[in-house]
Curated annotation (Swiss-Prot):
Subcellular location: Nucleus, Nucleolus
Keyword Magnesium: no
Family of this protein: Belongs to the bystin family.
One GO MF term attached to the UniProt entry: snoRNA binding
Organism: Monosiga brevicollis (Choanoflagellate)
GO cellular component: cytoplasm; nucleolus; preribosome, small subunit precursor
A Pfam family: Bystin
Residue stretches of biased makeup (Basic residues): 1-11, 25-34
Purpose: Required for processing of 20S pre-rRNA precursor and biogenesis of 40S ribosomal subunits.
Location of the region described as Disordered in the Swiss-Prot/TrEMBL record: 1-91
Name of the protein: Bystin
Keyword list, A-Z: Nucleus, Ribosome biogenesis
Transmembrane segments: none
Main location: nucleus
Length: 414
């Protein structure tokens, strides 16, 4: 009885079930390929037919929004947007929680003023950059008209994206205009963005735009967006409100999605400006603490910052990146040692931030430093002493192994 029961199969073999199953979609891959081909076709500049399609879609969407608004009681309604990782605990935290562990007192601010340029260059706001771009574009168009004839945008395209700019100037949440979503696929995307007047965007619009461009632009293009649009807006917001808007805080976190573009277009230009305030450095450094960044991009950024003229922002950003405990190349370690050794002949009072940064570096990479470099750092400690931090730095240097010696420095000197 059991033998008969074993010979009967209740189900067909799995391979036959897969082959014979007619419910499996076999044309999904071709649909995806066709969709990709359609996306690639948008890379060309807009012609008149495409401009009419965009204008029609934008008008339909605007009409739908107007109808829905008229049915309401006049109160703006926020529409929830699906998110990928915003539901995590660290994303729900307020921006102030990220940089609460950075403590800066008045003595640090006084000491850092000695390292600030006597007459810093006037910082350009986002509106200044937009006006400069517009003037440059007018000059370029005038030269093209005199040489090869007019090559301006279609007036319908300009009208559409001016309307998009009006939507973004009051955007809070929900769907972005369809005409705005195709901007990353346009060759003249930068010119189109300036038509929407980014200086008038809301903070929520800036976050949505950063999220869109970080996902769809190439690294060099994203770098330009971070440098020309996002960075000036963040600095303007901090300067005006003494804190960072939550949507801009999230925009910076999304910008780190492309770490190479973020460092080249946002963080390094901020350090090179020479007028980065401690408040800006603390806020942005707090965001870096929470994010995971690839070691290659962080190493290149540390190498560049170590070679820059000193500022308080440099100490904060170096400390944050050093505290991530990367396995750094020896070239980066040597550059950081040279960065600190430059102060051996500098008799100005150094802020506590500098001593804290040196302590973190020695704690994390004491065994990657040569014995000669350790002696050079000990010479620096004789010139610049902090009553609480310097003894700890000296102990870490003396009681640890070196890159070129297995024996601690204090035993080898006996």
């Amino acid at each position: 009885m059991s033998a008969k029961r074993n010979t009967k199969l209740r189900h067909a073999p799995l391979e036959h079930a897969y082959v014979d199953d007619k419910s499996v979609r076999r044309n999904k891959r071709s649909k995806q390929r066709g969709r990709m081909q359609d996306d690639e076709s948008v890379d060309a500049p807009l012609n008149e037919k495409q401009a009419q399609v965009i204008a029609r879609q934008a008008q339909l969407q605007q009409n739908e929004e107007d109808v829905s608004d008229s049915e309401q009681t006049g109160q703006p309604v926020d529409i929830d947007v699906p998110s990928d990782d915003e539901g995590q605990a660290d994303d729900l935290a307020q921006p102030e929680d990220a940089y609460r562990h950075f403590e800066i007192d008045e003595h640090d601010e006084v000491a850092l003023r000695a390292f600030m340029p006597a007459e810093p260059a006037q910082r350009r706001t986002l509106a200044d950059i937009i006006m400069e771009k517009i003037q440059g574009k007018r000059t370029e168009v005038a030269s093209q008209v005199s040489q090869t004839g007019p090559r301006e945008l279609n007036p319908k395209v300009i009208e559409v994206y001016q309307g998009v700019g009006q939507v973004l100037s009051r955007y809070r949440s929900g769907k972005l205009p369809k005409a705005f979503k195709i901007i990353p696929r346009l060759k003249n995307w930068e010119e189109i963005v300036y038509i929407t007047e980014p200086e008038n965007w809301t903070a929520a619009s800036m976050y949505a735009a950063t999220r869109l461009f970080a996902s769809n632009l190439k690294e060099k293009m994203a770098q330009r967006f971070y440098n020309l649009i996002l960075l000036p807006r963040v600095r303007d917001d901090i300067a005006e409100y003494k804190r960072l808007n939550f949507h801009l805080y999230q925009a910076i976190k999304k910008a780190i999605f492309k770490p190479g573009a973020f460092f080249k277009g946002f963080l390094l230009p901020l350090c090179e400006a020479g007028d980065c305030t401690l408040r800006e450095a603390v806020i942005i450094g707090g965001i870096l603490v929470r994010k995971s960044i690839p070691v290659l991009h962080s190493s290149a950024a540390m190498l560049k910052m170590a070679e820059m003229p000193y500022s308080g922002a440099t100490s904060i950003f170096l400390r944050v990146l050093l505290d991530k405990k990367y396995s750094l190349p020896f070239r980066v370690v040597d550059a950081v040692v040279a960065h600190f050794y430059r102060f051996n002949a500098d008799h100005r009072q150094l802020p506590v931030l500098w001593h804290q940064c040196l302590l973190v570096f020695v704690q994390r990479y004491k065994e990657d430093i040569t014995s000669e470099q350790k002696r050079a750092l000990l010479d620096v400690l004789r010139s610049h002493n902090h009553y609480a931090i310097t003894p700890e730095i000296r102990r870490e240097l003396v009681q640890s192994k070196s890159r070129d010696r297995e024996m601690p420095l204090e035993e080898s000197s006996r």
